[in-house]
Amino acid sequence: MIKARLSLFSLLLFSASSFADSHQVYGTYLVQEKNSHVQITDCGDGSPCGVVVWLDPTKLQPGITPDTARSKAGKPVLGLTMLEGFSRQRDDWRDGTIYHPGKDKTYASKLKRLPNGNLEVKGCISIFCQTQIWTEVVQNTE
């Protein structure tokens, strides 16, 4: 009986701790402006990289499609790497960069998975940071 309770307690503890793991940032997210999806995967070295995988056509300028949308620097936005260079810290990912295609600017960045599954994304210039909450996109499997 005690063994069964300990096993159940261990299972619940493991499940809860893995769900709330702030390092599990991989997935697809709707950015705060609700105009694009960024897919975060492993860069190949264990750190996260984020690539633009969808643009909302209703939020683009007239005559521009997701396939023809360009950054201020003239790069195609679809497929653009906008998050990279992160290192794992105790509670989050830090020392990375986030690229803003509309401004052609790159900022210092931090990433952290929130307990509700959303992603906290910070972009910083020196000590001044702006925080956004990106919503996890649930893929329809039907």
Locate each region found by the language model.
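N-terminal signal peptide c-region/cleavage motif recognized by signal peptidases
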Residues: S15-S17
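Short polar/acidic secondary-structure junctions
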Residues: C43, P101, K112, C124-S126
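Central antiparallel beta-sheet cores of small beta-barrel/beta-sandwich binding domains
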Residues: Y26, Q32-G102, T106-Y107, T135
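Bacterial N-terminal signal peptides that target proteins for export
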Residues: M1-L8
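Short, solvent-exposed mixed-charge patches
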Residues: N140-E142
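N-terminal helix-cap/turn-to-beta initiation motif at the start of protein domains
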Residues: F19-T28
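C-terminal terminal-subdomain/extension
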Residues: S109-R113, G117-L119
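Short, exposed beta-strand-loop hairpins at the edges of beta-sheets
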Residues: L119-T131
